[in-house]
């Protein structure tokens, strides 16, 4: 029984790697499943792989699941369980009456569990998918834990592939202990700080009038989130 942890910041290709691993294991006739708490990537990958063909979706849908309900899955049911966005795992979700801890249940359900995570992307107090939590349950369930250095993803696939942009944002938000010097002339981005929400709205409207591709993103600031 083995567990592998793959780390990577935002935009480093964790989900792309997860789906490629899924296809690789499926082609080897191994009972494999992709699991993530968020339904959006599951639905997106399902649509992409089946080209929205309903008949194909019936067969492929079983390759994608939520960690919800893994408490009812017998031990070692899967040859491999690939857990994307593992930092979003929680102890228990409403309605999962037999659930105890989703990290534990992911490891229990598979001979090989692969966790893809970024601890800095945990966004609520209920998120428990940390390396410490995974290590704890590996010891409890006698699963050999592997965290090879080469399994840490560092290349940036978003933001025009600019690692400097991510460093710049981290520095602005004071997320790093040391200040990072970034040559802004190399960044093809329009970065501004607004003192007025009205000015921000007007700037977005001007941008949106060009090609209708400008949006305000404000996740996890509303009561229903």
Question: Residues of each region from the PLM?
Answer:
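Hydrophobic anchor at the beta1->P-loop junction of P-loop NTPases
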Residues: 6
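The conserved Walker
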Residues: 10
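Conserved glycine(s) of the Walker
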Residues: 13
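Walker A/P-loop NTP-binding motif
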Residues: 17-27
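Conserved helicase/translocase motor-coupling segment
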Residues: 18, 124-129, 148-167, 174-225
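Inter-Walker segment of RecA-like/P-loop motor cores
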Residues: 32-80
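Signature of the SF2 helicase/ATPase Hel1-core->accessory helical subdomain module
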Residues: 82-152
């Amino acid at each position: 029984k083995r567990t592998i942890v793959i780390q990577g910041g935002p935009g480093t290709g964790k989900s792309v790697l997860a789906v490629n691993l899924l296809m690789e294991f499926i082609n080897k006739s191994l009972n494999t499943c992709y699991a993530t708490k968020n339904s959006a990537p599951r639905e997106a990958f399902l649509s992409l792989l089946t080209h929205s063909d309903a008949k194909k979706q019936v067969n492929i849908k079983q390759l994608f699941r939520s960690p919800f309900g893994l408490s009812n899955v017998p031990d070692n049911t899967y040859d491999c369980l690939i857990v994307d966005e593992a930092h979003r795992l929680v102890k228990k979700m409403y309605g999962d009456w037999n659930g105890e801890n989703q990290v534990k249940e992911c490891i229990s359900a598979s001979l090989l569990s692969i966790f893809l995570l970024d601890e800095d992307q945990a966004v609520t107090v209920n998120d428990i998918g940390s390396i410490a939590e995974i290590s704890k349950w590996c010891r409890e369930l006698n699963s050999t834990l592997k965290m090879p250095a080469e399994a840490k993803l560092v290349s940036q696939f978003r933001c025009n592939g600019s690692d400097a942009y991510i460093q710049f944002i981290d520095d602005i938000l004071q997320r790093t202990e040391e200040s990072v010097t970034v040559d802004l002339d190399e960044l093809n981005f329009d970065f501004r700080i607004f003192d007025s929400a009205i000015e921000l709205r007007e700037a977005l409207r001007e941008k949106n009038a060009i090609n209708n591709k400008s949006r305000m993103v404000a996740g996890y600031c509303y009561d229903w989130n």
